[in-house]
């Protein structure tokens, strides 16, 4: 891996993704990892090795970068419509987690949702990126 800190790697990942405009230019995680770090992915270690890059993609999304993903990999979405499948995927994943919580707590799904509504009302909103 190239000697770098997280901030430098974040800049590299963002720059690489900005070059991948639209779903037709998507980049696979293993390729993004290799280009950002200068390292190769070992097949049996793919998930562990790419964890840092996945966390940086998450950080960029939380900063408001329009990073989508699809069957061909990650890409910078110039068209807001290209973000919809990614947004839907996150939505379904969140609902699946809440269903698991409902089953573990043995309460109705509506009760789990109500608790989160109350929790969110008690917390200040996270500022949205510009």
Language model feature labels by segment:
Residues 81-105:
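Short, amphipathic alpha-helical interaction segments positioned at domain boundaries
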Residues 37-53:
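Short, positively charged loop/turn segments that connect secondary-structure elements
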Residues 70-78:
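Minor-groove-contacting beta-hairpin "wing" of winged helix-turn-helix DNA-binding domains
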Residues 61-71:
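A short, conserved structural fragment
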Residues 100-130:
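Exposed, interaction-prone assembly regions rather than primary DNA-binding/catalytic cores
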Residues 54-58:
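Short, hydrophobic-biased segments on the C-terminal half of alpha helices
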Residues 23-41:
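Short acidic, hydrophobic short linear motifs in intrinsically disordered regions
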Residues 1-19:
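Short alpha-helical segments that sit at the start of domains
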């Amino acid at each position: 891996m190239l000697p770098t800190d997280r901030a430098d790697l974040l800049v590299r990942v963002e720059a690489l993704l900005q070059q991948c405009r639209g779903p037709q230019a998507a980049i696979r995680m293993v390729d993004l990892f290799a280009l950002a770090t200068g390292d190769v992915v070992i097949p049996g270690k793919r998930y562990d090795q790419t964890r840092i890059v996945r966390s940086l993609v998450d950080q960029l999304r939380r900063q408001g970068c329009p990073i989508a993903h699809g069957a061909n990999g990650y890409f910078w979405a110039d068209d807001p419509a290209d973000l919809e499948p990614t947004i839907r995927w996150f939505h379904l994943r969140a609902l699946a987690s809440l269903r698991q919580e409902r089953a573990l707590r043995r309460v109705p799904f509506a009760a789990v949702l109500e608790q989160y509504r109350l929790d969110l009302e008690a917390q200040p909103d996270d500022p949205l990126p510009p």
